[in-house]
């Protein structure tokens, strides 16, 4: 049985030696058997055939045969075939492997291309498709590729072999017809694996544009359909220092309303990204980080986002959203988002509620985001409205062409409940707005203590109502620019820093005195009721009543809060009129500045009239 093994070994050895001899002989004899002009003209024709343009080679070709047959060309230019002969690109050096057997037979076929310092000029048509011309082999393959049974199909006569393409230190200029802008990419390095036109493609591209390095990873089983502006499966990811983005699914590069898949976006520094793209949004500095991961699908004139996972400044949200672009109407973003924690300041900035048309550092029409309507329903376990914290919040944002409304329908605040309505007028929000706020049963004592507010302020569980408006843009309005009314009511509390008995005693012997010099006890009250009108930077108080068990404090006058000044008149009188003889009314004036008011008893001649 083993007798035939030596013979078999000899046969194998002889066969290998013959093959090796032929291989070496071909490599040695190739320079004498192959015409350099044939290979040069062959690749020149191949380039012209592929691109559909006229390829010209000015440099002297170099042919290598070891370890594989390869031709190296230099000073290549590609021009249009018409009379204008417009230059479309240049290549400093191009090398390609070729078939030795085909070259000996007088035919040249090439693969494994390497381009050194190519400089390409591309045009992106208004349809979104790159202009591949309609004459080259690539353009014909793109035009004739079709989808059958979920697969890309191409006629065999158009299905040419490619292999691998590598690009080193290239430059690409893309003229975008729709915007009229030209985008330049420098330092382009690419590695493309594409066995033949009908095969799947994988590509990695690294480039630099506007001072930023970008990396694009792309793969598709149907690249011709993708390049031709048809819908097909693809995977793409973009990475840079300013953002990372990823998409996997079915897409159409010329028609965005044909999309289905999963996408992710992460922006670690929003202001830096806006600076890079030369955009400015007032107040956006508070929105530092943003990320989004979602399933996306096209719907008529828009997109639907399901399984949304969104994060802004570390606040995470889940939900569903949709965006619509109805013909002839404003775009609209709607949806429902549930946050674990939410910062309303970041939320306002994120949705551009403070964007002003005509700002010195903004576009004159307010920008594209100004043309977006919103209809969002929001909820949060905890929400920050600096310096306050809300819990179990239900809110909504509605923005139309004429107004913007923000509502907190329900929330827990300091042991009580809070609701609010903010409304901004006009589409660019520079027509002013109004705010309505209602707080019920909140622990103002704990709030005042936590905020470390100074002065005689009511420590009690109470309710507050506020209704103010302004004609100034909301992002510019200050406290002195609003008008309206504020009211506070409370039961059973205390007013620290106001000792009624000590004030009476000091008023009998001094013409004026600092309140904090005589008030070392709190004034206990059973009812606190104060209302103030706000206008021109001042609060006007009309008959505020603070009723204690024995005495009542009545205040009226003006508080210019812009300067922290005080201009009030007041009276301390008996709560029960029947005991007035023992507690006669004491009228006084309040001046100085908050939080250190100065008391000045009214003259005796005025006490009668005041009484």
Name each model-derived stretch.
Residues 1-52:
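N-terminal type II signal-anchor transmembrane helix
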Residues 34, 384-386:
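Short, surface-exposed ligand-recognition loops at beta-strand->loop->(often short) alpha-helix junctions
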Residues 48-75:
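Short extracytoplasmic
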Residues 50, 358-373:
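N-terminal leader/targeting segments and the immediate start of mature chains
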Residues 68-90, 95, 109-141, 163-173, ...:
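Small-residue helix/turn framework positions
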Residues 98-104, 150, 469-475:
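Outer-membrane beta-barrel proteins
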Residues 139-154, 358-365, 512-519:
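Surface-exposed acidic, glycine/proline-enriched linker/cap segments
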Residues 150, 155-169, 178:
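Non-catalytic accessory/assembly modules
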């Amino acid at each position: 049985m083993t007798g035939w093994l030596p013979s078999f070994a000899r046969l194998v050895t002889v066969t290998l030696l013959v093959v090796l001899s032929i291989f070496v002989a071909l490599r040695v004899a190739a320079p004498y058997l192959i015409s350099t002009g044939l290979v040069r003209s062959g690749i020149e024709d191949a380039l012209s055939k592929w691109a559909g343009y006229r390829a010209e080679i000015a440099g002297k070709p170099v042919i290598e045969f070891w370890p594989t047959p390869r031709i190296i060309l230099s000073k290549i230019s590609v021009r249009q075939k018409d009379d204008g002969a417009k230059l479309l690109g240049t290549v400093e050096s191009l090398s390609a492997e070729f078939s030795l057997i085909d070259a000996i037979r007088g035919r040249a076929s090439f693969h494994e291309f390497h381009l050194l310092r190519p400089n390409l000029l591309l045009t992106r048509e208004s349809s979104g498709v790159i202009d591949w011309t309609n004459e080259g082999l690539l353009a014909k393959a793109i035009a004739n590729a079709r989808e059958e049974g979920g697969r890309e199909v191409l006629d065999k006569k158009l299905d040419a072999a490619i292999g691998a393409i590598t690009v080193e230190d290239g430059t690409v200029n893309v003229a975008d017809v729709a915007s009229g802008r030209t985008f330049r990419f420098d330092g382009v390095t690419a590695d493309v694996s594409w066995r033949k036109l009908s095969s799947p493609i994988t590509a990695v591209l690294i480039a630099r544009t506007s001072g930023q390095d970008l990396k694009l990873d792309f793969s598709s089983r149907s690249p011709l359909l993708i390049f031709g502006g048809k819908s097909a499966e693809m995977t793409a990811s973009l990475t840079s220092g300013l953002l990372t983005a990823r998409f996997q699914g079915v897409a159409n590069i010329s028609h965005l309303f044909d999309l289905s898949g999963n996408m992710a976006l992460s922006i670690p520094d929003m202001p830096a990204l806006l600076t890079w793209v030369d955009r400015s949004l007032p107040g956006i500095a508070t929105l530092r980080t943003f990320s989004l991961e979602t399933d996306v699908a096209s719907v008529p004139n828009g997109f639907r986002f399901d399984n949304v996972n969104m994060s802004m400044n570390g606040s995470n949200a889940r939900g569903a959203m949709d965006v619509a672009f109805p013909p002839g109407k404003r775009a609209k973003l709607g949806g429902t988002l549930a946050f674990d924690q939410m910062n309303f300041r970041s939320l306002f900035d994120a949705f551009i509620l403070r964007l002003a048309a005509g700002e010195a550092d903004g576009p004159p029409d307010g920008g594209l985001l100004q043309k977006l309507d919103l209809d969002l329903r929001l909820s949060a376990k905890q929400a920050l409205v600096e310096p306050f914290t809300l819990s179990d919040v239900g809110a909504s944002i509605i923005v139309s062409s004429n107004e913007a409304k923000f509502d907190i329908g329900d929330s827990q605040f300091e042991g009580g409940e809070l609701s609010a309505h903010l409304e901004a007028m006009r589409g660019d929000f520079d027509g002013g707005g109004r705010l309505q706020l209602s707080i019920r049963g909140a622990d103002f004592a704990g709030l005042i203590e936590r905020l470390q507010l100074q002065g005689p302020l009511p420590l009690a569980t109470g309710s507050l109502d506020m209704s103010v408006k302004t004609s100034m843009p909301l992002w510019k309005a200050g406290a002195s620019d609003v008008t309206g009314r504020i009211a506070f009511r409370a039961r059973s509390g205390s007013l620290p820093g106001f000792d009624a008995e000590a004030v009476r005693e000091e008023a009998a012997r001094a013409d004026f005195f600092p309140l904090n010099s005589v008030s070392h006890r709190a004034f206990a009250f059973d009812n606190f009721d104060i209302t103030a009108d706000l206008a021109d930077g001042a609060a006007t108080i009309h008959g505020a009543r603070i009723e204690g068990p024995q005495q009542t404090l009545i205040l009226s006058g003006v508080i210019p809060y812009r300067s922290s000044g005080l201009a009030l008149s007041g009276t301390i009188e008996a709560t029960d009129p029947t005991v007035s003889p023992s507690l006669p009314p004491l009228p006084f004036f309040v001046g100085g500045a908050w939080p250190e008011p100065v008391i000045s008893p009214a003259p005796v001649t005025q006490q009668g009239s005041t009484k």
